[in-house]
Amino acid sequence: MMLGGGGGCGAGGTWLGFLVFLAVSLRNHSTCEDIDAEDRLMVDLFRGYNSLVQPVRNRSELPMIVKIGMQLVLLINVDEKEQVMHTNVWLTMKWDDFQLKWDPRDYANITQIRVAPEKVWLPDIVLFNNADGNYEVSFMCNVLILSTGTVLWVPPAIYKSSCIIDVEFFPFDDQLCSLTFGSWTYNRDEIKLDFLTSDRVDFSEYSTSSIWDMMDGPAVLTSDRSRIEFQIRIRRKTLFYTVVLILPTVLMAFLNVTVFYLPTASGEKMGLTMNVLLSIVVFLLLVSKILPPTSSSIPLVAKYLLLTFVLNIITIMVTTIICNIYFRSPITHRLPPWVRKVFLDILPLLMCMQRPHRKNVIQRSHRRLLETGPSVEENPMRSGEHHPLCRHTHNQDSCRRVRIQSDELDDELSPEAQRAIDAIEFITENRRDEEITKQFRDDWKFIASVVDRFLLYGFFGATVGGTIGIIFTAPSVFETFDENATLVKLKQLYDMGLANDTVLGIF
């Protein structure tokens, strides 16, 4: 029993090995037949084929239709200074070649083959608006040929195309760049272009950019269908420029306003304005290095910098005038009545500036003079009747009477006492003149403070108005944009082959 069982197992193993050998042999035979069939197909297809001749039976079949599609893979860069867009695309071209048809049943059911591009006729489609002299694709990949005679060529390419940059709303700007393709040697009567599957750019393999948001990608055919233009509409991501350029510029503009809040006596007004001026010049140079030197429009950020620059220049001028007013004195300048009326009475009231009343100041000054001035109590005359102080009393009759009595007693004073009285009179006159001069200087200083406050309000309003009127005029300042959702809708539009952008409500 055991021996019999062992013999059965040996026979079963032999049969299993034979079946495996037979299957492998049949598979190798089938593979060899497929290879032989493909070789025969290649020989049959390209026997007498001329890749330099346009594949049409006769001239009546012209113009030949070449369908083109473009798949955007990567937006590498947009150089605003050079006005060049750098992209990585897959260009898809499709046409029919009657010489490359076959019956798959005659060639082991082979429905498609891949051949080198130099073996077949290729349409000389080039990028017309290239910016580096490279008109053709950079990599000559294989051509896919179907049994129906349809030829499909999908060469990848990295293009540098010219793009007119609109800098009016920089950095809150949208740009519309295009890639224009067409035949270099065939005219419109020999080749006509058409869309491959949709009149749009294919974004199915697109990798998002860290600088630009993709908004749309329509395609346009010229009226004679000799050229096709793939448009790429993009919007700049503004976070970087907002933090690095916009916010510092706005802060500098408002820092320029604080000059009028800085006391003139500190001596730092002019230093602050000059530092702000140098900062603005640095930012202007930075913007000039980023943007193209175009004269068609002034960039939004350049407008704001120019406004800040002009306000700073005016600030320097009026600060010089304020410093001149602050250090005026009655010796060099006379205070006109209208200046006193406007800057000491009207403007302080309008700007809620309070100043102690002039009479109270004079009375306190006189009281201070009486308390700290020289005394004549040791003189035989009463101190209240000494004539140098009679000017400070309110009783003019008493003053005249004291002066008469003082003149009658001048002869009775010794020379030393007379010299002392003259010295006291001289000192008193000087103190009185100093008080009057100080009062006039205080008036000029207060006028300078009033002008400072008036310009503080005026320049603050101008800065706020300029900020709102310039920066907030950009169309996309307050718009939120979801690039991922937009790309999903653009892919749906491409798959549907729609020409109407409003179907999905994107824009």
UniProtKB/Swiss-Prot annotation:
Role summary: Non-alpha subunit of nicotinic acetylcholine receptor (nAChR). Involved in nAChR sensitivity to nicotine.
GO biological process terms held by the UniProt record: chemical synaptic transmission; inorganic cation transmembrane transport; monoatomic ion transmembrane transport; regulation of egg-laying behavior; regulation of locomotion; regulation of membrane potential
Record's signal peptide: 1-31
UniProt-listed SUPFAM superfamilies: Neurotransmitter-gated ion-channel transmembrane pore, Nicotinic receptor ligand binding domain-like
Record key words, sorted: Cell membrane, Disulfide bond, Glycoprotein, Ion channel, Ion transport, Ligand-gated ion channel, Membrane, Postsynaptic cell membrane, Receptor, Signal, Synapse, Transmembrane, Transmembrane helix, Transport
UniProt subcellular location: Postsynaptic cell membrane; Cell membrane
Family in the record: Belongs to the ligand-gated ion channel (TC 1.A.9) family. Acetylcholine receptor (TC 1.A.9.1) subfamily.
Domain of life: Eukaryota
Protein name as annotated: Acetylcholine receptor subunit beta-type lev-1
Effect of deleting the gene: RNAi-mediated knockdown causes a resistance to nicotine-mediated paralysis.
KW Transcription (keyword) present: no
Pfam families: Neur_chan_LBD, Neur_chan_memb
Keyword Chloroplast found: no
Biased composition (Basic and acidic residues): 379-392
Designated gene of the protein: lev-1
InterPro entries named among the record's database cross-references: Neur_chan_lig-bd, Neur_chan_lig-bd_sf, Neur_channel, Neuro-gated_channel_TM_sf, Neuro_actylchol_rec, Neurotrans-gated_channel_TM, Neurotransmitter_ion_chnl_CS, Nicotinic_acetylcholine_rcpt
Disulfide bonds: 163-177
Membrane topology category: Multi-pass membrane protein
